[in-house]
C-alpha cells in the first residue's frame, strides 16, 4: 500500500516537472529569440535561435532614428502612469467602501459591475468611436486614459473588495474605540494590510496601455499620437523589408519600465501582510 502511494506520488511529481519544463520552454524560447534578435547586426529570422550573440545597439539606434519610437514611448508612458495612479486610487477607495459600508444600491451596483465585464471590448468599439467623434477626442490621450480607467474599475473593484473583506472588522472597531476617524482607520489600519493587492492592481493598470493594440489603434490615427504597440505594428506592416530586429528592440524597451515598476513594488507583496495590525 505504501509502495503504491509512493509510486503515485512520484508519478505526479514527474508529470508536474514535465509540465513545468514544457511551459518554461514555451515561454523562454521566444523571449531568447527576441533578446538575441535585438542585439544582432542586420535582419534576422523570426523563427531561428542563433547562439552567436552580438552586443550591437544599431537596432536600437535605428528604431529611434527611422521611426517616431521616442514619441510613441513617451505617449505610452504618460498614459500608463496616469492610468495607474487614477485607476488604483479609485479601485482602492471603491473596494474599501464596498467592503466596510452598507449604502443604497450596494448589491445592485456590484451585480452591475459583473454584467459590464460580460461585454467584450470588441463589442463596444463602435460606441467608443462614436463617443470619441462626439467629444472630438480622436488622437487624444486623455480619452484613452478615460477608457482604460473606466474599463478596469468594475472587475478590479470586485477583487479589491474581496481582499478588503479578509481584513478583520475587529481592527476597525478597535481603532474606532481609540478615537480614529474614517480616514485614519482606512489610511493607517486597513490600507497597509492590503498593500499586496494594491501593488498588483497598480502593476496591472500600468501594463495595460503598453500591451493594448485594439483600442488604441481604433482611436489613434496620426503617427505622432501612436502608442508603442500601434507604432511598432504600423512600422513593421509598412516596412519594405520585415525588420524583426527593430521590432525586438522595441519589445525589450517596452518591458523595461514594467520590470522596473515590478522591482519597486515587489516588497509590497509581502510587507503588507504584517505592517498594519499594530497601528492605531
Swiss-Prot record:
One of its GO terms (molecular function) is ABC-type maltose transporter activity. One of its GO terms (biological process) is maltose transport. CDD domains: TM_PBP2 (cd06261). The chain crosses the membrane at residues 15-35, 77-97, 110-130, 142-162, 200-220, 244-264. This is Maltodextrin transport system permease protein MalD. The keyword tRNA-binding does not apply. Part of the binding-protein-dependent transport system for maltodextrin; probably responsible for the translocation of the substrate across the membrane. The keyword Cell membrane applies. It is found in: Cell membrane. Belongs to the binding-protein-dependent transport system permease family. MalFG subfamily. Residues 73-265 form the ABC transmembrane type-1 domain. GO terms for cellular component: plasma membrane. InterPro entries: BP-dep_ABC_trans_perm, MetI-like, MetI-like_sf. It comes from Streptococcus pneumoniae (strain ATCC BAA-255 / R6). Gene3D superfamilies: MetI-like. Keywords: Cell membrane, Membrane, Sugar transport, Transmembrane, Transmembrane helix, Transport. It is a multi-pass membrane protein.
Amino acid at each position: 500500500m505504501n509502495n503504491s502511494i509512493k509510486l503515485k506520488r512520484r508519478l505526479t511529481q514527474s508529470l508536474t516537472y514535465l509540465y513545468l519544463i514544457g511551459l518554461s520552454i514555451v515561454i523562454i524560447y521566444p523571449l531568447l529569440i527576441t533578446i538575441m534578435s535585438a542585439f544582432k547586426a542586420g535582419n534576422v529570422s523570426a523563427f531561428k535561435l542563433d547562439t552567436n550573440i552580438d552586443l550591437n545597439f544599431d537596432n536600437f539606434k535605428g528604431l529611434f532614428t527611422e521611426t517616431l519610437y521616442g514619441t510613441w514611448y513617451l505617449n505610452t508612458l504618460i498614459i500608463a502612469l496616469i492610468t495607474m495612479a487614477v485607476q488604483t486610487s479609485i479601485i482602492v477607495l471603491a473596494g474599501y467602501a464596498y467592503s466596510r459600508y452598507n449604502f443604497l444600491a450596494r448589491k445592485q451596483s456590484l451585480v452591475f459591475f459583473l454584467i459590464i465585464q460580460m461585454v467584450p471590448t470588441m463589442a463596444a468599439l463602435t460606441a467608443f468611436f462614436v463617443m470619441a467623434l462626439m467629444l472630438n477626442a480622436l488622437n487624444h490621450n486623455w480619452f484613452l486614459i478615460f477608457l482604460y480607467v473606466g474599463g478596469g474599475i468594475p472587475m478590479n473593484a470586485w477583487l479589491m473588495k474581496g481582499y478588503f473583506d479578509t481584513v478583520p472588522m475587529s481592527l476597525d472597531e478597535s481603532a474606532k474605540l481609540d478615537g480614529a476617524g474614517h480616514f485614519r482607520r482606512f489610511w493607517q489600519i486597513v490600507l497597509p494590510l492590503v498593500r499586496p493587492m494594491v501593488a498588483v492592481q497598480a502593476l496591472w493598470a500600468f501594463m495595460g496601455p503598453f500591451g493594448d493594440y485594439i483600442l488604441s489603434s481604433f482611436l489613434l490615427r496620426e503617427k505622432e499620437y501612436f502608442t508603442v504597440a500601434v507604432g511598432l505594428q504600423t512600422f513593421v506592416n509598412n516596412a519594405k523589408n520585415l525588420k524583426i530586429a527593430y521590432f525586438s528592440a522595441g519589445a525589450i524597451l517596452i518591458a523595461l519600465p514594467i520590470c522596473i515598476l515590478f522591482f519597486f513594488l515587489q516588497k509590497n507583496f509581502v510587507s503588507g501582510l504584517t505592517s498594519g495590525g499594530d497601528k492605531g
